[in-house]
Amino acid sequence: MRWFLPWTLAAVTAAAASTVLATALSPAPTTMDFTPAPLEDTSSRPQFCKWPCECPPSPPRCPLGVSLITDGCECCKMCAQQLGDNCTEAAICDPHRGLYCDYSGDRPRYAIGVCAQVVGVGCVLDGVRYNNGQSFQPNCKYNCTCIDGAVGCTPLCLRVRPPRLWCPHPRRVSIPGHCCEQWVCEDDAKRPRKTAPRDTGAFDAVGEVEAWHRNCIAYTSPWSPCSTSCGLGVSTRISNVNAQCWPEQESRLCNLRPCDVDIHTLIKAGKKCLAVYQPEASMNFTLAGCISTRSYQPKYCGVCMDNRCCIPYKSKTIDVSFQCPDGLGFSRQVLWINACFCNLSCRNPNDIFADLESYPDFSEIAN
């Protein structure tokens, strides 16, 4: 029996090895049986993007106030869709106007939407809630605006410098009936001044407190940008050039360019900008149904084919008299444009922080 056991083990081992070798050398199956997963039906959802991109040779000309952007396919330039327009994955809404595409009305495809306004976050100041974009005055010294949860304020009281050296003891005091403090000159001398300022004349200083408006330092801020890029708008400034030496807001009418004239068609061949546009015929200004008593031939700022914008470079303010159908008349200050220049620093008239940016370099100017 002892010699029979090793022989049996050797035979079993050889048989197992033959089975493994036969399995390894057997041909692999040529087909596999499986059930594919059902594909998603996309026929009901249109495809708005096509690849490769097919773009027109030149970008479109957008109306004034409409952004020229890259479409949602990241292919071509397009005029952004505006509030209430239809939008898709290709035709996107104007991001510079805070618009987004609302697909809620196209369930369940969610393919075509409508451009809607993004509702910004309101603000709370001293327990009072303000809406996004709302301007308000928490007190008589500041004018504030709520901007998406943040409050930005501009002072209404001018931080003028103290009186000149001839006023030995200047101090700020509260004047009854006025919000902002004013400088007064308190002179302790009991004798006449040796050197009186030229703009006030010679007078005796007897120790009394004289109102600072008698020593008024005239200040006038620059005019703000026109409130509209085309058509009739308003610009404002602050000035204390008045009998009370009190800062007051002044306003004037402005019209940078007409909305109903396509100035792009007037740009000469080979040029990219038309800095100034002037109609050939004179016209009368109209305001609230009233007509100016005389005709004018105003100049307007033009437009560019690229990303530059044209703004007034030399201008002045004129008084225009209006006559109404009922016989009443009035006059208004109006911006009169003499020259314009075109540059890359296009700023939003509603941006209260635009003045913090640097002035455009002269290399960007194109007359």
Swiss-Prot record:
Keyword annotations for this protein, in alphabetical order, are: Cell adhesion, Disulfide bond, Glycoprotein, Proto-oncogene, Secreted, Signal, Wnt signaling pathway
Residue ranges occupied by any IGFBP N-terminal domain in the UniProt entry: 45-118
Q: Which residues form the TSP type-1 domain?
A: 215-260
Asked whether the keyword tRNA-binding is assigned, the reply is: no
Return the Gene3D superfamilies for the record: Complement Module, domain 1, Thrombospondin type-1 (TSP1) repeat
Asked if the keyword Secreted belongs to this entry, the reply reads yes
Q: Which Pfam families match?
A: Cys_knot, IGFBP, TSP1_CCN, VWC
A Gene Ontology biological process term: positive regulation of cell differentiation
Q: Where in the cell is it found?
A: Secreted
The signal peptide here is 1-22
- Tell me its family: Belongs to the CCN family.
Q: Protein name, please?
A: CCN family member 4
Source organism: Homo sapiens (Human)
Gene behind the chain: CCN4
